[in-house]
Structure formats: structure tokens, C-alpha cells
């Protein structure tokens, strides 16, 4: 029987990746309840890791099909901020290496702020290229949100340090000569698009937090410009500022009533 204590066993188990490991096999015969509990936790962890890798590989199917055709540089493109009443629309384009593995990458809306921030840093370290596009509230009013979104996406693609050979885009088509595939709910079905959604989301959230420091009465750092009850009440009380989208109904109606 292994004589090391439970804490030492717990620490060493983190280095074991295969149940055929000789030391692990000895643990299976250790009668201490604490040891057997750690063994079961190890099995659960490995099963969770297996499921996550399978999910990731499923999300890589669009990229893999392009890799199989000899295409190397694939940019995922996504945007954040089409619906808010204030702030810009932000798009990101991300080119990942072919052999990338990004566990837990997903549609940014499904992730906690902490997880998004963690993945944001990891993606920045691992990506071959990242491009950002930002279109202001004023230009959204001038163009309309759909055209502004396309412009932000094109800006993001043009900002890439590496020219992409193919674009994977979340439910959009942009007027560029680069071959592209539009994927419905792409941020949940493509690793590259999910990565771009995280970059765009964190980038925009940070901008809105800065706006919250400039205009603390509006609470932008909480609602990120979306039409929450708190935000609508602040608009009624304090009026419309430059960063509000005047073409959006709640803002337009507030302006009609006079500031």
C-alpha cells in the first residue's frame, strides 16, 4: 500500500494522465476512503476532459474541412453590440493556429465574465492574428445598425496582420472578395467564431466600463448600454448623451419629448 498522505496523493494525481500508470494502479488497491474518493474524482475529471475535447472537435468541423482543402489561414468573424441603446458595435476577426486546443471556448454570451477574461488572454497569446473593428453610436445612426455591423466586421478583417484565405462569419456576409462561409449561430458551432466573439465582447465591455467611469449616473459598467430598467430610468432622469443611439426607438422617443 502507498504510504504517502492524502494531500500528497491529491497533488500527484494531477500529473497522472493514464489509468495504466503503475503508481495509479497501486492507488486502486489502497483501502483508505480518502484515497478512493480521490480516485473517483480523478475518473470524473478525465471524463469531463474527454467530453470537452469531443465538444471542441465538433466545434472545429468547419475549420477542419477547410484545412483538409489546404487552406491555412481561416479567420472567424463576429460582432457584439447590435442591440444596446448606447455605445459602439464592436467586431473581431481571429486567426487561430491549425493545431489549436482551446478548452471551454464557446459563444461569449454563455460564459461568465471571469471565464471570458481568462479566455481573452489565452486567445491573445495563441492566435496568429487578431483584428478589431469599432463603429460609433453616431455612425450607427448614420448608417443603420446592419450596415454599421458590416463595416465593423470589414474593419476587423482589414486589421489582421495575416491575410485570411477564408472567413467564417456569424450569420452575416460582408462585401469582401475573400471566400466566406456564413454560419447561423456560428459562435456556438465554430471555434474561430467563438474566439472572435470573446475578443469582441471583452473589448466592448471594457469600453463600456470606461464610459461608466465618465458617466457614472448611467450605470454603463453594469448593463453595457442595453435597455435595462436601470438604463431607461437613467435616460429619463439625466437625458441623452452623445454615446446614445438616437435612431433606436427608446432614445428617439426620449428626444421627441425634449431633454
UniProtKB/Swiss-Prot annotation:
Known EC number: 3.1.26.4
Catalysed conversion reaction: Endonucleolytic cleavage to 5'-phosphomonoester
Cofactor info, note text: Manganese or magnesium. Binds 1 divalent metal ion per monomer in the absence of substrate. May bind a second metal ion after substrate binding.
GO process annotations (BP): DNA replication, removal of RNA primer; mismatch repair
Disulfide bond annotation, renumbered to this chain: none
Keyword annotations from UniProtKB, A to Z: Cytoplasm, Endonuclease, Hydrolase, Manganese, Metal-binding, Nuclease
InterPro entries the UniProt entry points to: RNase_HII (IPR022898), RNase_HII/HIII (IPR001352), RNase_HII/HIII_dom (IPR024567), RNaseH-like_sf (IPR012337), RNaseH_sf (IPR036397)
Annotated localization: Cytoplasm
Binding locations of a divalent metal cation: 78-79, 170
Gene Ontology CC terms, in alphabetical order: cytoplasm; ribonuclease H2 complex
Names of the cofactor(s): Mn(2+); Mg(2+)
GO molecular function term, any single one: RNA-DNA hybrid ribonuclease activity
Chain ranges of the RNase H type-2 domain: 72-259
Entry-linked NCBIfam families: PRK00015.1-1 (NF000594), PRK00015.1-3 (NF000595)
Family, as annotated: Belongs to the RNase HII family.
Function (record text): Endonuclease that specifically degrades the RNA of RNA-DNA hybrids.
PANTHER family cross-referenced by the UniProt entry: RIBONUCLEASE H2 SUBUNIT A (PTHR10954), RIBONUCLEASE HII (PTHR10954:SF18)
Name of the protein this chain belongs to: Ribonuclease HII
Protein's organism: Anoxybacillus flavithermus (strain DSM 21510 / WK1)
